[in-house]
Amino acid sequence: MKERSTELVQGFRHSVPYINAHRGKTFVIMLGGEAIEHANFSSIVNDIGLLHSLGIKLVVVYGARPQIDANLTTHHYEPHYHKNTRITDSATLELVKQAAGMLQLDITARLSMSLNNTPLQGAHINVVSGNFIIAQPLGVDDGVDYCHSGRIRRIDEEAVHRQLNSGAIVLLGPVAVSVTGESFNLTSEEVATQLAIKLKAEKMIGFCSSQGVTNEEGRIISELFPDDAQQRIDVLEQAGDYHSGTVRFLRGAVKACRSGVRRSHLISYQDDGALLQELFSRDGIGTQIVMESAEQVRRATINDIGGILELIRPLEEQGILVRRSREQLEMEIDKFTVVVRDNLTIACAALYPFPEESIGEMACVAVHPDYRSSSRGDMLLMRVAAQARQQGLQKLFVLTTHSIHWFQERGFLPAEVEMLPKKKQALYNYQRRSKILVLDL
């Protein structure tokens, strides 16, 4: 008898909305040389092939810093930098081109066979490289000639779009030519960032050695706004980190985000399946740089009723919440505040004001099981308390049978039935015997 896998079923159900949302979108993937050297790179390439098979338009940008440094060491060349930018003289340029060319051939070959030994074996992936980027020299700075180190002059985004629309993966590296036919060494973060901006990409994705950006406790920070990310960059650079995958990607992500790229994702190249988990799960696995959070706290609308019902039904069945019908919710929806993450309602609460007595009830407080160890309840309490103050209310009360200590830890004090508004006293259920707690606003 075959075994049933409920985890597979649940995972597929959760991923389907993201499969639909990502189809037809353009993603720019930045692969640093460190990621290419790692043992997990074959799995990353296979996952890139899987994304392509799902109808996602992909531009892959690869870097070659460790490969270039290894080439220089082999040929007894000492790398030179000015203001943390490599100086690429003619001899160095030849070694840069050699390293970049070998990587291009290797990545192309791997992508071409990425769907082998999968149910999609036989599906053809067309990988295209070309002179989509025109470069120009960095020039001379403080009397230092950067020689063949360059920057992007322009991108032929229309040509890139044509290749993407024809079903190809576009592969670009750190070497580009100028209008005079010279070759220049570019940084992979500049190439990936400018491509993401010019192509109006939905996402830019980068790989680093860790799972993302961590806080002081070592926990992954799931979201950063550009200003917060810039602060992280400043701290890393002050510590002497100018070239790690994390700092290079964050520099590009901040610029991309401020230029219209909705989300930039930083994930680990060491974790098998990190790319898929980041893109096809609600909470991901790494760090996102975003202009607007994937999670919103807002007033509920009539379109939120289904999500609220799905959230509160299990609690009603356990007797934790008083049952509410759909009709009642429709009539009272303007009283509700919701926390929504990627179109899933993960928390809700309602405020029922009694203005004659300057008091309000916080009711129907519910948080999705996956988020109860986080601060969503506190977010709701802060929002509902702010709404109560705006309405001129001086106190907030709750009736609870299971969350007494949670509310007391946040300043609520025990009270008697007589302290409730007159209308609420008349409706108090003595059989349920809910505890009454009051917060002075």
Swiss-Prot record:
GO terms for cellular component: cytoplasm. It catalyses: L-glutamate + acetyl-CoA = N-acetyl-L-glutamate + CoA + H(+). It is an enzyme of class 2 (transferase). InterPro entries: AceGlu_kinase-like_sf (IPR036393), Acyl_CoA_acyltransferase (IPR016181), Asp/Glu/Uridylate_kinase (IPR001048), GNAT_dom (IPR000182), NAGS_kin (IPR033719), NH2A_AcTrfase (IPR010167). One of its GO terms (molecular function) is L-glutamate N-acetyltransferase activity. One of its GO terms (biological process) is L-arginine biosynthetic process. Keywords: Acyltransferase, Amino-acid biosynthesis, Arginine biosynthesis, Cytoplasm, Transferase. Signal peptide: none annotated. Its EC number is 2.3.1.1. CDD domains: AAK_NAGS-ABP (cd04237), NAT_SF (cd04301). Disulfide bonds: none annotated. Pathway: Amino-acid biosynthesis; L-arginine biosynthesis; N(2)-acetyl-L-ornithine from L-glutamate: step 1/4. PROSITE patterns: GNAT. It is found in: Cytoplasm. Residues 295-434 form the N-acetyltransferase domain. Its main location: cytoplasm. Belongs to the acetyltransferase family. ArgA subfamily. Homohexamer. NCBIfam families: N-Ac-Glu-synth, PRK05279.1. This is Amino-acid acetyltransferase. The gene is argA.
